[in-house]
From Swiss-Prot:
Essential for the control of the cell cycle at the G2/M (mitosis) transition. Coiled coil: none annotated. This is G2/mitotic-specific cyclin-1. Belongs to the cyclin family. Cyclin AB subfamily. GO terms for biological process: cell division. Keywords: Cell cycle, Cell division, Cyclin, Mitosis.
């Protein structure tokens, strides 16, 4: 199900590497500027900015929230959280937690100027009932000019590592306090074989999003090749591949801009590609175009040119990562 929003009016920031982007203060400043409440000359807030964190990819583990929101706090933003797994508020495990957005959480969303949604790694957001409610809410907040920050969660779908056992709830919660870094779990060599999935998102924006597009994973797989292969199974949709050091900024006035994350020690230090590419399947072949540094959103994003194909393995792997309504993933999409 796609929303009927005008993509020209949507404000958003969609990096190839969300952790690296949110550690770059220039990116934070650009995000804040989109709210209309930030004085760029003074590099300070001109009025209150509320950031709502939705921990979709990390099961509401506190250290991820702290890592992703620390620079917004440094700029004086208020932070609220909408818990997806809700394990801490209910005392239940994510497998048995409630899956309804509470009135308080809806109020946080109503007062938000920025909504931060980490990558689409697990399935906790995508239980059928919660997803439909989330789509309605996300569409409403996007329509009123709230800035969306994240990755594939906001698109129709994402090239996702959700089949990786190390992104499942039980594994991540078991190692919740093992490391100090707030970065998501990295893929490791020598584990069980798994494939990248086309995991459906909230459909605020059309297309299939691929983060870290020019990178290789820990097994040596080149993600842009994996993404092209995936698109042949979803030939009606456009792919948007964003490199690790690139950031796609939607200005809300029909324009987009490509930002560059500063080169820094860590994952992106050796990454030289700073591009965003669009990919279309034409007569069975994937055609790739590197977009300009700025341009029209209507030329960047397009609706599917035919029926949308759902990844049949999405439900299969969701059953290996159970949440309260996982079984509803087996129902036909509406």
């Amino acid at each position: 199900m796609m929303t009927n929003l005008n993509v020209r009016t949507i404000k958003g920031c969609f990096p190839g590497s969300l952790p690296d982007a949110l550690n770059d203060m220039s990116v934070i400043n650009h995000i804040l500027s989109l709210t209309g409440r930030f004085d760029e000359g003074q590099a300070a807030l001109a009025s209150t900015v509320n950031v709502v964190y939705v921990g979709t990819a990390v099961y509401d583990i506190p250290r991820y929230r702290e890592e992703y929101t620390k620079n917004f706090i440094a700029r004086g933003c208020g932070i609220s959280e909408v818990c997806v797994a809700e394990a801490r508020s209910t005392g239940a495990t994510p497998c048995a937690a409630a899956t309804m957005v509470t009135p308080d959480q809806l109020q946080h969303l109503a007062e938000a100027h920025i909504i931060l949604l980490p990558e689409v790694t697990p399935f906790s957001l995508y239980d059928a009932g919660r997803k439909r409610a989330s789509m309605r809410v996300s569409g409403q907040v996007a329509a009123r000019g709230v800035v969306l920050v994240g990755g594939g969660c906001c698109f129709r779908a994402e090239h996702s590592d959700s089949a990786n056992p190390k992104t499942c709830a039980q594994y991540m919660l078991s190692r919740e306090n093992e490391v100090d870094s707030g970065r998501p779990v990295e893929m490791e060599e020598g584990g069980a074989k798994w494939e990248y999935l086309c995991v459906h998102g909230l459909s605020v924006l059309p297309g299939i999003f691929c983060p870290q597009h020019s990178s290789r994973d820990a097994t040596g797989l080149l993600l842009n090749e994996s993404f092209s292969k995936m698109l042949k199974r979803h030939p009606t949709e456009r792919g948007i591949g964003v490199d690790c050091r690139a950031v796609l900024l939607l200005m809300g006035d029909g324009r987009y801009q490509v930002l560059t994350i500063a080169n820094r020690e860590g994952r992106t230090a050796s990454v030289k590609d700073i591009n965003i590419q669009i990919k279309d399947v034409v007569e069975g072949n994937v055609q790739t175009t590197t977009i300009q540094q700025q341009g029209s959103v209507e030329e960047l994003l397009r609706k599917p040119c035919g029926p949308v194909v759902r990844d049949p393995f999405e439900a299969y792997y969701a059953m290996a990562n159970p949440t309260a309504l996982t079984e509803k993933l087996l129902c036909a999409p509406r």
